[in-house]
Amino acid sequence: MESRNRIFGAAAKEFAAKGFAGANMDRIARAARLNKAMIYYHFAGKTALYRAILSDMFGAVRAAVTAVASSDRPPDEKIRDYVAAIAREAEARPHFPPIWLREIAEGGTHVDEATLVYLRDVLGALGGIIAEGARTGRFQPLPPFMVQAGIIAPLMVFFATSRLREKIARLTRADVAALSRADVIAHIQRVTLAQLEGKI
């Protein structure tokens, strides 16, 4: 199991840095300090390894947001919890934001049906929260995908751009490097709720 975890960790970093097309199995083996045959012992190939990483990412998100949606908290608190849950899973996996941003840019080229099921369930959890809020008259019945896009985009960009923000900060007076996780999450929570409540 240790060798599998080492492969998984090395591959996650490689895919985050190079994308699926640019990722190299020899580099993954070297980073994991294993021979390449060991990769193929645990995973059928590059595609299977990549999809295992996607499954870990989106399986964790699905579990987290499903728990949020099924809680007995009011809809507005569920939205706050939903945003925080996705942020928590993304932060726990530094490879998650760059991999997902790249997949979005490439039209989900390497997303398989199992991953699509995870995505469907995540949207379903959000849709359930929105519907609950709409029934009470608190929320507008907005399309879950539109709301999700407004959550995912800023979260992924924030977590994926720490080095870029440091470079920008050196050239401008904007202290973008000092943006905190808590500030960004709170902003996304406020904007999402304002959108659902018809205030913007």
At which residue positions do the language-model features occur?
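N-terminal intrinsically disordered/low-complexity leader segments
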Residues: M1-E2, K13, R170, I200
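Short, structured helix-loop boundary elements
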Residues: R4-N5, M25, T47, R51, ...
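Short secondary-structure transition hinges
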Residues: A48, A63, A87-A131, F145-M146, ...
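Hydrophobic alpha-helical connector segments
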Residues: T66-P98, T136, P144-I151, A182-I185
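C-terminal peripheral helix-coil segments that are non-catalytic and often amphipathic
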Residues: A85-R88, A92, R120-Q140, A153-I200
